[in-house]
UniProtKB/Swiss-Prot annotation:
Keywords: Cilium biogenesis/degradation. Belongs to the IFT43 family. Component of IFT complex A (IFT-A) involved in retrograde ciliary transport along microtubules from the ciliary tip to the base. One of its GO terms (biological process) is intraciliary retrograde transport. The lineage of its organism: Eukaryota, Metazoa, Chordata, Craniata, Vertebrata. This is Intraflagellar transport protein 43 homolog A.
Length: 207
């Protein structure tokens, strides 16, 4: 085994010639020897007065963080609990509970009691061109005799001679009576039917 293994000054394995199970056993034995040698060196250094460097303290953060008093007593102080309770409570924005911002919906009775008859919408302001009536046209025709010739080319004398006065053209408004109207229409129809029957009974002349 010593022939196949070469160890340096630092105790590191330089070369392994064997392979397989025996080689692994040999490597394990050499590693155990090196570990025991390191343990002896460290014990000798401590006996000589050399102190190993201190281990760094383990730091904890986040939810696992505790104060010295809480670690000793095993119970968290009330101040820390109050702070955490305030932090975990649901916070509402300031001014959200203002009653002035809430809209008020009127009751149905109040809406019905309002008098809507007095509320009249303003009429639209539309300029309408005034249309001349027949009376205005007659007055203009009587005033301006030159109107009988239109544009100096068209002669309207024939039309003005045929025009009838207003009293002859206008009809009086007479109310219709249903019974009277029915009798008049029925009598006219009967006379027409009688005339038609008489014409059918007349014999045709023989040629």
């Amino acid at each position: 085994m010593d022939d196949n293994l070469q160890l340096g000054d630092s105790g590191v394995v330089k070369n392994v010639a064997k392979l397989g199970r025996r080689a692994r056993l040999a490597a394990e034995q050499t590693s155990s020897l090196e570990e025991s040698r390191h343990v002896r060196k460290s014990s000798s250094s401590t006996s000589m007065g050399e102190v190993p460097p201190p281990k760094p303290a383990r730091r904890q953060g986040g939810w696992a963080e505790e104060t010295s008093g809480s670690a000793k007593s095993g119970r968290r102080p009330a101040v820390v609990e109050d702070v955490e309770d305030r932090r975990l409570r649901p916070q509402t924005p300031q001014g959200s509970d203002d009653e002035g911002d809430i809209p008020v919906i009127p009751d149905l009775d109040e809406v019905q009691e309002e008098d809507l008859t007095m509320q009249v919408a303003a009429p639209p302001s539309i300029q309408v061109n005034r249309v001349m009536t027949y009376r205005d046209l007659d007055n203009d025709l009587m005033k301006y005799s030159a109107f009988q010739t239109l544009d100096g080319e068209i002669d309207l004398k024939l039309l003005t001679k045929v025009l009838a006065p207003e009293q002859e053209v206008r009809e009086e408004d007479v109310g219709w009576d249903w019974d009277r109207l029915f009798t008049e229409v029925s009598s006219e129809l009967l006379t027409e039917w009688d005339q038609g029957e008489k014409e059918e009974q007349v014999p045709l002349p023989v040629l």
